């Protein structure tokens, strides 16, 4: 039995009662749906109609859409969800990771070039403030990969650079700020990627680094 009052949940008695009551009232299909996070590319009503007729997902991810559409999407999702949903976006550079009108603060490598963790905090603040304004509560960020090839098309400027210590400091500052703002941070890593100069979405890329330097 999971102790919901203990780490990492720390729920109050009334919160635990809500969890138990809600869980008891869910069908097997609804419970299974909580395991899914569905990508909505355009956040249009017909997308939600199609998905929610198949399952009731516990999480949804938005691509970049206009602000009004993102707000309408959140309202649509909440109206269909028995459990408050997780709503995520790639909040790597600013609020522009979720809405077209969002603020582009700077790519992580630009932020790292300042060598000022205060800038990472400001970028994270913009991400969290603008995403939460349209209902998002989950950041698919920060990326904590280490840049090992400036020609790599996947990570490169999406990272906080080639210095592991700077990556750690910047990534930590981002996580602390978005969590303080009430969003969940999901540290992102692309295992084995970063060495090749080709896009692994299009071809099978190659990691030619030996095991020892890769692990260290």
Feature annotation, model-predicted:
Residues 1-216:
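Glycoside hydrolase catalytic-domain context in secreted enzymes
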